[in-house]
Amino acid sequence: MRPIVINGTVLCDPITGIPRYVYEVVTRLDPLLTGTGLDVRLCYRDDGRPLHLPELKNIRIVPLKAIKYSYNLVVLPHYLRRHKAFFLGLASDMLMTRRSAVVLHDIRPLVMDTDRGFFRFKFWVHCLSIKAFARRVYTVSGDQRRLISERLGIPLDRIGLTYNGWEHLQ
């Protein structure tokens, strides 16, 4: 069976915003995998920072050695190809593989003039890689879904919705 690989590098950062979303999804997914036989792995860039996760029973943690910018562009794609894995990017991940689904939380840097020029350019390249490679894109609201379709030219039928944060409003 083809493994499913989640990029967990953001779980080395403080657990707020997008890392919080990834944390919540991974910790809730782990017990649901019991008895399914699915091979789910969480890969992360092992640069000495701790991974902020409780012990997982059904998701295998895979540290990958890499320098900062080579992880997403070289090391992780190589790992995915070598293991013929399906990639699940929960944190607006840049990717270079066709067997993938990505959550693109928002495209704020492309629609608002609040970020530095280089960051906006880098984010644009990032979004183009998602458009070119992701089999399916998910986002967090209907408005973002429409914006992603309009600005990036991704057909609406390739963009799904995954709402986040509802449990924090209770």
Model-derived segments and spans:
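Carbohydrate transferase catalytic cores enriched for Leloir-type hexosyltransferases
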Residues: 1-170
